[in-house]
């Protein structure tokens, strides 16, 4: 059976992604000096203004406006004619400490309060919720092809803008890739969409020619393209007004872009601006780590891992494995393997993936998973041999 599946990505200059990067840059600045800092940092951007708000408990000082302006400058909003300028935008902050009612459950998990002395039990989940991880062998990154290609196109857009190849481009942009599948295997790319902000004087014809030559053709392998592939480059005909001047941005509003592009499920919790005691983030990373190692070990061609937690409790309340009919062994045995090989309590996840480090801003654009341009601990294939012992 043939079907089409589509995923999108956005560039670092998209207003929602700006907010994710600002929130994670503040998180990194705190973790750099206080690895045990508690951070729940949200950002909003609009024309000429940034607002940073949230709950932060730390023993270090961070110059939040300075961090905000550095991020905006790095992204490329450095001129007033872009509608947003790192030097002149206003930065408002409204920060409180983490609620003591939340902190008491995170500082000492229910298991620890009941007398269990394991150090890992001392950390309870920072909230209730469900988190999913996903992996597939259809790309070498163990990611679905549509989101994999969409992210590469978005990164290339930023690259050719920043290195001067296409100096008329501006920071905001979006990409989208539609892949045709036959019997659940990708066989071709059916459509590519690239929308990029640009200077007003450049023509649509020039943009289409340059994007095709310097972005699409350099990113998408020829074997995925054919005479029937459709290309939509700035299909509205003009994209001059963009970034926060064109749309208000918020942290956590690109959760499908951040994960698997719609392949597999999402528990709804965003990542950026959250320290690793928040299982929205750390457990989703762990679920990806589990799924990727299982697929790499040959347990299945495609796996989704579902985890659920209760606030203040260390041990997951449920573990779900879905192999979509691609399993090489029974799903029940896969669950047993996961329980033997991986410790999915928050304290163990933080320990095993070394999540108290300032590593998060680099994840806040172009996806948290399947990255080859940065080293991320949940992407390591360090459990494959151990998994194979139990197959």
UniProtKB/Swiss-Prot annotation:
It is an enzyme of class 2 (transferase). Pathway: Amino-acid biosynthesis; S-adenosyl-L-methionine biosynthesis; S-adenosyl-L-methionine from L-methionine: step 1/1. GO terms for biological process: one-carbon metabolic process; S-adenosylmethionine biosynthetic process. L-methionine binds at residues 55, 98, 247, 278. The keyword Disulfide bond does not apply. The keyword Zinc does not apply. This is S-adenosylmethionine synthase. It comes from Clostridium novyi (strain NT). The lineage of its organism: Bacteria, Bacillati, Bacillota, Clostridia, Eubacteriales.
């Amino acid at each position: 059976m043939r079907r089409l599946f589509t995923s999108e990505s956005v560039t670092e200059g998209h207003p929602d992604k700006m907010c994710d990067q600002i929130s994670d840059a503040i998180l990194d600045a705190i973790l750099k000096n206080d690895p045990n800092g508690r951070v729940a940092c949200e950002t909003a951007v609009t024309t000429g203004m940034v607002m940073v708000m949230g709950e932060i408990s730390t023993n270090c000082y961070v110059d939040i406006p300075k961090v905000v302006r550095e991020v905006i400058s790095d992204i490329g909003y450095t001129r007033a004619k872009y509608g947003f300028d790192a030097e002149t935008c206003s930065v408002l902050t409204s920060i409180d400490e983490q609620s003591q009612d939340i902190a008491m459950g995170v500082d000492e998990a229910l298991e620890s309060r009941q007398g269990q002395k394991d150090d890992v039990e001392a950390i309870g989940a920072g909230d209730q919720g469900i988190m999913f991880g996903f992996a597939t062998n259809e790309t070498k990154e163990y990611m679905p092809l549509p989101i994999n290609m969409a992210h590469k196109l978005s990164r290339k857009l930023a690259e050719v803008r920043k290195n001067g190849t296409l100096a008329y481009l501006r920071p905001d942009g979006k990409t989208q890739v539609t892949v045709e599948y036959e019997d659940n295997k990708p066989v071709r790319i059916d459509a590519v969409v690239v929308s990029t902000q640009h200077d007003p004087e450049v023509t649509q014809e020039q943009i289409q020619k340059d994007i095709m030559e310097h972005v699409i053709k350099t990113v998408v392998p020829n074997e995925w393209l054919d005479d029937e592939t459709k290309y939509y480059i700035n299909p509205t005909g003009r994209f001059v007004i963009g970034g926060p001047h064109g749309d208000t941005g918020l942290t956590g509003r690109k959760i499908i872009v951040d994960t698997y592009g719609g392949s597999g499920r999402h528990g709804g919790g965003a990542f950026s601006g959250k320290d690793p005691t928040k299982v929205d983030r750390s457990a989703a990373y762990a679920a990806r780590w589990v799924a990727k190692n299982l697929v790499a070990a040959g347990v299945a061609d495609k796996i989704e891992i579902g985890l659920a937690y209760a606030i203040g409790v260390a041990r997951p309340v449920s573990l779900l494995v879905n192999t979509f009919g691609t399993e090489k062994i029974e799903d029940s045995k896969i669950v047993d393997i996961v329980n033997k090989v991986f410790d999915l309590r928050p304290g163990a996840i933080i320990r095993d993936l070394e999540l108290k480090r300032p590593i998060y801003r680099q994840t806040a654009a172009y996806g948290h998973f399947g990255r080859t341009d940065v080293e991320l601990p949940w992407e390591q294939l360090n459990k494959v041999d151990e998994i194979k012992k139990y197959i």
